[in-house]
Amino acid sequence: WGALFNTALKINNTQKIGLQATYSTNTDNIISDRSGYDFEQTRKISSTAIEYTENHLLTTRLYGEHQLTPKGIRLSWGGGVNQTSRNVPSLRRMFYFKNFDDTTDVTIPFQAYVPFGSADPYRSGRFYSNLEENIYNGNADLTIPFFLGTQKQSVKIGGLYQKRDRKFDARVM
C-alpha cells in the first residue's frame, strides 16, 4: 500500500512554495519447496525455504520558486529527505539429501545438511538482516535572463547537496 501527498501555495504571481510526499510499503512472504537430482554429487536433494521481507520508502520534498526582480531573475530551491528500509526478520532454509543408491529404499531417510564450522545461508541455516538508508538533499538555482541581440537568452547557476547515511546489519546462523 502507499500514500501520496502534494500541495502548493501560490503566494502571488512571482512566489510559489510546495510540499510533496510519497510513502510506500510492501511485503513478501515466500515459501519454497524444491526437490530434484544433483547428478554431479550423485544424490537426490530436497530443500525448503521460508522468507518474509518488508520494504518501506518515504520521500519528502519542500520547494519554492521566486521571481526576485521585475526583469525576471528567478530563484528556485528545494530540499528533501528520503528514507528507505528493508527488513528480513527471519529467512530459514533447510537442505536434505539422499544418495542415488538409497532412493529406491523408502526406509532410508533423507539426511539433513548441517554446515560444519561456519553458517551457510544458501543450504541450511537462518539469515536476518536490516537495511536503513537516509538521503538528505538540497538544491538552489538562480536563472538570469538577458538579450543577445534580439534573442532572449538565460543563464542558470546553481548547486546541489546530497548526504547519504546507510546502516546495514546482517546475521547468519
Identify the residue ranges that each predicted region occupies.
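Hydrophobic, lipid-facing positions within transmembrane beta-strands of outer-membrane proteins
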Residues: 1-5, 56-62, 79, 134-140
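Short loop/turn motifs that connect adjacent beta-strands in outer-membrane beta-barrel proteins
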Residues: 13-14, 69-74, 146-154, 170
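Flexible, solvent-exposed coil segments and beta strand-coil junctions
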Residues: 35-46, 111-124
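Residue-level signature of outer-membrane beta-barrel architecture
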Residues: 5-11, 66-68, 144-146
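Outer-membrane beta-barrel and related beta-rich outer-membrane complex signature
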Residues: 18-39, 43, 84-97, 164-173
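Transmembrane beta-strands of outer-membrane beta-barrel pores
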Residues: 23-27, 68, 81-87, 130, ...
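Extracellular loop and loop/strand-boundary signature of outer-membrane beta-barrel proteins
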Residues: 45-51, 63, 124-129
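Transmembrane beta-barrel wall of Gram-negative outer-membrane proteins
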Residues: 1-30, 58-60
